[in-house]
Amino acid sequence: MKFVHSATRTRDLDAAIRFYKMLGMRLDHKSELTKNKATLAFMVPPEENFAIELVYNWGKDSPYEGGERFGHFAWLVDDLDVTYRRLVEGGAQEVGRTPAPLQGEGQRIAFVADPDGNWIELIEHRD
């Protein structure tokens, strides 16, 4: 068995694609589901072993159901400060904590939010 993707809903597909590109991902492909009135965009990292499926439902005005149950995505980064600054300057929302050590774990973490408010954890391991 292999874990292949996680799906998150978006209200602005283009903004979501731009955000995940800032994290080094690329758009693998899009699928138009006309019967469901939805567009799916699959964003993959360079290793291509996992995807984030961005789900855009056309014409939906009310909040998506189930959104409050999601925790966060996590990325391992080489330089936390550089990545955090690039994302914030690119429009990511600062949430949770700014770059700081995680007590007793030998790593530093920070959180930002994507255009739809999903939290993204950035992790830098320290030797």
Where in the sequence are the language-model features?
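Short histidine-centered beta-strand/loop micro-motifs
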Residues: 31-32, 63-66
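Eukaryotic phosphotyrosine signaling hubs
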Residues: 3-5, 68-73
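Vicinal oxygen chelate
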Residues: 30-32, 39-43, 74-75, 84-127
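Helix N-cap motif at beta-to-alpha junctions
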Residues: 12-13, 78-81
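Short, solvent-exposed aromatic-acidic interface loops
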Residues: 58-60, 127
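Core segments of cupin and vicinal oxygen chelate
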Residues: 1, 8-49, 103
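Short, charged/polar surface micro-motifs in flexible loops or helix N-caps
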Residues: 47-50, 60-61, 80-81
